[in-house]
Amino acid sequence: MAGATVTVEEVRKAQRATGPATVLAIGTATPANCVYQADYPDYYFRITKSEHLTDLKEKFKRMCDKSMIRKRYMHLTEEFLAENPSMCAYMAPSLDARQDVVVVEVPKLGKAAAQKAIKEWGQPKSRITHLVFCTTSGVDMPGADYQLTKALGLRPSVNRLMMYQQGCFAGGTVLRVAKDLAENNRGARVLVVCSEITAVTFRGPSESHLDSLVGQALFGDGAAAVVVGADPDDRVERPLFQLVSAAQTILPDSEGAIDGHLREVGLTFHLLKDVPGLISKNIGRALDDAFKPLGISDWNSIFWVAHPGGPAILDQVEAKVGLDKARMRATRHVLSEYGNMSSACVLFILDEMRKRSAEDGQATTGEGLDWGVLFGFGPGLTVETVVLHSVPITTGAATA
């Protein structure tokens, strides 16, 4: 038998990309139903038949007033909720009704975002080699990744990865995974989709479960998609951000700070009051670990994409590292206009940042700055840290 003509090392080298993973396109989508935060307390207590809980309603109004959210989008309409009272009652068995919604709507909303990203990318969808789909709800087999593959008409041989119930840090997770896939598979083009529908967490108020009420004041529905690939073809692909490094860590002494449990009543969340404090206390170390190799220690010299879990988290992070208010502008804009969409938020923020940078005449997609950070915060407490590098804005770029 003749000996092998190539070595394993040569094969591996040929499989790997030359350059870093790059975001090549971004698309976002929301349900049509828009709810304004100023009107939401009256609506929420009316539809859940809880108007007799007057003190709790006043407390909820204060939560909404302090949320820094102007509006949110929700698939659940008043008409639908009126027909599904089990979803409006506090802790009523309702998982079947919720599941019936999300297994259909999660891939549908994800498809809308993916179509926009693929259109901006401008290449045949047959060039998509990998699909990473992330959602907090709607576990089924085959899953939303399969449904989206069918709905978009992707190749049957597309390599799929389905991520369920990761929570609010997962916008960073999907980029970390996409980076590894793109850089270790030469020519790969990874479609990443985060699609979040609050139907699994919506429920009526309870005086004994105020952390659930916090979620009702913050969460919204949305989907975002990005196309990621290394070694972009400059003739037909327009890079937006380079993914330089990515890391995940569990914060010390944070067990139980954020957790969720899927039960007959849907997905229940528990939050400790000290979540903003735990994140801000540890943000310096995360920044140092990520940027020390680059010789960067001025946190106002980089652009920021931070999961907007709530205004207190953003306020305390800003204070801890001495950030100028301008650094969180894109993050606060997404919180204001969409609420907390879990994993999709940071991708919405990337989209807002590159568009606003172009509109404002900035030199780069990162608000005129070269280096940036993307943070995901969620159950664990888990923190995802992604180091980004912007690209120069050319005429017509970054505004699609």
UniProtKB/Swiss-Prot annotation:
One of its GO terms (molecular function) is acyltransferase activity, transferring groups other than amino-acyl groups. GO terms for biological process: flavonoid biosynthetic process; polyketide biosynthetic process. Pathway: Secondary metabolite biosynthesis; flavonoid biosynthesis. Its EC number is 2.3.1.74. It catalyses: (E)-4-coumaroyl-CoA + 3 malonyl-CoA + 3 H(+) = 2',4,4',6'-tetrahydroxychalcone + 3 CO2 + 4 CoA. The active site is at C168. Keywords: Acyltransferase, Flavonoid biosynthesis, Transferase. It is an enzyme of class 2 (transferase). The primary product of this enzyme is 4,2',4',6'-tetrahydroxychalcone (also termed naringenin-chalcone or chalcone) which can under specific conditions spontaneously isomerize into naringenin. Belongs to the thiolase-like superfamily. Chalcone/stilbene synthases family. This is Chalcone synthase C2. It comes from Zea mays (Maize). The gene is C2.
